UniProtKB/Swiss-Prot annotation:
One biological process term in Gene Ontology: protein folding
Periplasmic face residues: 29-46, 89-145
Locations listed in the record: Cell inner membrane
Function: Required for disulfide bond formation in some periplasmic proteins. Acts by oxidizing the DsbA protein.
Annotated protein name in UniProt: Disulfide bond formation protein B
UniProt source species: Xanthomonas campestris pv. campestris (strain ATCC 33913 / DSM 3586 / NCPPB 528 / LMG 568 / P 25)
Cytoplasmic-side positions: 1-11, 64-70, 165-172
Amino acid sequence: MNPFRWGFRAQFLLGFLACAGLLAYAIYVQLHLGLEPCPLCIFQRIAFATLALLFLLGALHGPRGAGGRKAYGVLAFIAAGVGMGIAARHVWVQIRPKDMMSSCGPPLSFLSETMGPFEVFRTVLTGTGDCGNIDWRFLGLSMPMWSMVWFVGLALWALYAGFKHRGPRKLF
């Protein structure tokens, strides 16, 4: 079965399942392997969850018109783009020389209790926290690098599914 030939709903359902699988693996790594997520990791999870929600809504709605499919494709692409930006920042923090790293910041729970949401977002993206540590690798890539690969792939998948030309529906 070639997923490039599937209908919009099936393609968006596949995108949802990919995001759900990635989130499930992140929770597994946290709970069973004992790797605590840094603030940037948590923001990437939020981006994957947002992307999963958009894929699921698109799959459940299954708009008949090209405009609706394109809207879902663009919204999912934007969510993946935000995730790509966060993952890129995380990769940049990880590849910086250790002597250029600033001290670890407070945990996200403390930040959310003492600051507003926009200040927390700005602080997390400008600080490093524990985000410079590389505790996990697969095929030589760290988890934020893999997140970036997945965000790119899912962004392209959303655009493909949303903008694919679909001929008139045939009954048989």
